[in-house]
Swiss-Prot record:
Gene behind the chain: Cyth1
Record region (C-terminal autoinhibitory region): 388-396
Name this protein carries in UniProt: Cytohesin-1
Gene Ontology terms: cellular component: adherens junction; bicellular tight junction; cytoplasm; cytoplasmic side of plasma membrane; cytosol; extrinsic component of presynaptic membrane; neuromuscular junction; plasma membrane
CDD domains found in the cross-reference section: PH_GRP1-like, Sec7
InterPro entries membership: PH-like_dom_sf, PH_domain, Sec7_C_sf, Sec7_dom, Sec7_dom_sf
SMART domains: PH, Sec7
Organism: Rattus norvegicus
Amino acid sequence: MEDDDSYVPSDLTAEERQELENIRRRKQELLADIQRLKEEIAEVANEIESLGSTEERKNMQRNKQVAMGRKKFNMDPKKGIQFLIENGLLKNTCEDIAQFLYKGEGLNKTAIGDYLGERDEFSIQVLHAFVELHEFTDLNLVQALRQFLWSFRLPGEAQKIDRMMEAFAQRYCQCNTGVFQSTDTCYVLSFAIIMLNTSLHNPNVKDKPTVERFIAMNRGINDGGDLPEELLRNLYESIKNEPFKIPEDDGNDLTHTFFNPDREGWLLKLGGGRVKTWKRRWFILTDNCLYYFEYTTDKEPRGIIPLENLSIREVEDSKKPNCFELYIPDNKDQVIKACKTEADGRVVEGNHTVYRISAPTPEEKEDWIKCIKAAISRDPFYEMLAARKKKVSSTKRH
């Protein structure tokens, strides 16, 4: 017996034959519906997947910009904050900036201290918002100072220190009402404790102050009255037993960024302006970025070229030997995303569609190409986008 939908038993009545035909037609309709549903489900699944990858891509891009903003902050705090605000990564409010500094993730603590110590009105507001984020309730003064002085590195200038310690004293008294008669008392005692820390733990200070001397030094500072002796003894013992930890910069500053590069050396770079001139620059390859400096001693690079989605090729040049180029594959007219510092200190986007570079020797050229190839990272979305652009442009031509 044939086992397919065309087979009709010979002993069926006309009515039964009609019913069988209806059943088979309905079956075909249902199978078509099932297939249509499968296709719709697959389409929705693809949309959900592409939405997820779009979100993921946005997050990746955001994280990269935040990392670049942190590096800029560690080079120049004000420029770093400006970069983060301009790229929508930070709100231009003292509260948002204070929160960013308080979290301190990847930030150089000396740079935090420098920014907080600035004397312009906005920086002072950021300082107060930063201090407000510290919770000093029920901490004795030494404990509060330990917490505060660990969150940044005190700058060297007396006026900056004065502003910061004044803000600290106000916040401590706000969190612990009744401990001191005034913020002035708290301010004076805080300085006395910092000086005590230096005297007790600096090996160059031979004459170590006793607890009695510390108590005597702080007589009459509580609005003319004396502070409880027990309080002063406790503060003295706390500092004697455990010195303040001064934050070492946490390895995310520029010194660390450029400390162990993949490669560094002098190269010639062809300028991107209307007049093409070759300039000698000190190049450092690290963290999937190529940095270039005017001098090896410069703190701040003249330019930063992220290597993501770039390719590298050897090229011949009539003026210079041992040349290679960084370029965007399949997109000869697109400007490479990079930034450079102008002579007046402004950070601007680069205007190169290719970066042409000349090495001193053929061997160095080969080494640079090999190292840059290893550092280049590719974003599959970018390749997909480039392919789509190519397809669109070829469609337009036909």
